[in-house]
Amino acid sequence: MTPADLDTARQSALLAALPEPQRARVLEGAQVQSVETGQTIFLQDDPADALFIVLDGWVKLYRIATSGTEAVVSVMTRGRSFGEAVALKGGIYPVSAEAITPARLVRIDATRLRNLLQSDPVLATSMLAATYVHLQQLVEQVEHLKARSGVQRVAEFLLDLAA
């Protein structure tokens, strides 16, 4: 992992609030994974064996309904993390993840992270706080989806891209 990769990972919402020694422990065993446009990172209902931080590119999180239609849940960009809550629980991914551009990701092994959390109360408390912040962001996202028209959501998305 390059110094720039480490900076991006350290500044992610998942790790930014952690004390530096804990951040270093989490990233110690992490790997950089490169994916091409259209490449599947994981599928809905796969065992959640890792969580990810986007270094570069865009990743789409989506669900396939029983009717076979695809519902995009979120689009992740640089510095955003995904898969953390379910990976920490040891469950299955509730969504699929696919690169929509060439992308580079930090892949953090879920079992290793769960072991770290059990042995380090400071890390466990900090990760819990980070997960809570992520939950707040998801609640705000649902509110935006329900309270805005499609045109308003597209305009807001484009404004976010320009920022």
Question: Where does each model-flagged region fall?
Answer:
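Cyclic nucleotide-binding regulatory domains
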Residues: 14, 39-102
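Conserved active-site beta-strand element of glycosyltransferases/polysaccharide synthases
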Residues: 106
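Cyclic nucleotide-binding regulatory module and flanking cytosolic helices
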Residues: 1-37, 81-82, 86-87
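Short capping/connector residues at structural and topological boundaries
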Residues: 19-23, 46-47, 87, 93, ...
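Polybasic "coupling" helices that flank or enter modular domains
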Residues: 100, 118-163
